[in-house]
């Protein structure tokens, strides 16, 4: 199912406020395979239009920031959101976990 940035922002904000964690993966972020388990996500935006997504793994220095401006498409299937980007970066999957 395709989603707007605003829908995605609202859902991630709601899930985060309820203390949910996420597994985040991509085959290529800065030429490195990325797989972060048990991440916390904070969306900083004005109604999901402008802003960024801050993804960090508690108790580590692992942090990834994604600007909303480069997100081309957002899809959701089951408990996983897939972000596609305008600049050709590999898709990022964000899986909701307990």
Residue ranges: model-predicted function:
Residues 1-2:
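Surface-exposed beta-loop interaction hotspot
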Residues 5-17:
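N-terminal helix-cap/turn-to-beta initiation motif at the start of protein domains
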Residues 17-26:
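A short, Trp-centered hydrophobic/proline-enriched beta-strand micro-motif
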Residues 27-56:
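Amphipathic, interaction-prone secondary-structure segments
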Residues 37-44, 60-79, 97:
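Structured surface patches comprising rigid loops and adjacent beta-strands/short helices at the edges
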Residues 80-87:
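Short, exposed beta-strand-loop hairpins at the edges of beta-sheets
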Residues 87-98:
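Edge beta-strand at a domain terminus
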